Amino acid sequence: MNSINELLLIYGSNITKIKELVLAGANVNYVSPEGLTPLSCAESVEVAQFLLSRGADVNATNEDGKTALFSVSNVDTCRFLIENGARVNHVNNKHETALFYTTDMKKIRLLVEAGCDPLVRSYDGKRHYDLLAHNQKVSFINFLANRKKKMETVNAPLALAF
């Protein structure tokens, strides 16, 4: 890595260095040959906020069709991206959502509560739900079961009206 754009990728949490590089002309929407963008490497809300303020596209995709939401692991940063228009049901070239790329229950809860569909099937027929069930993520199964019960309770009066 030696270009100014590539340097943006290695300073994911260093806001001072990120600002210096952007002010020196680094492209906030740069996509590396590996499919990384400055926003996908942002490790803090502060860095993501700065990049968006300088024109970074919250829904920019790499050649695999992945957005920053697929790779950002910090839950607060993910929340910030969602609050700023990141599409939670965006699918990549394999028809996978960001859910397919996390096993962190905090990020899973955030994505599902923001409307990401855990039952979306990838082109090879897999669902995030199935992958976690296979890996014995009981907390995820319980979370979805409780969410379904809440939805049924909320929708019960509507169902009775028909």
State each model region's role.
Residues 14-22, 45-53, 75-83, 105-113, ...:
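Ankyrin repeat structural motif
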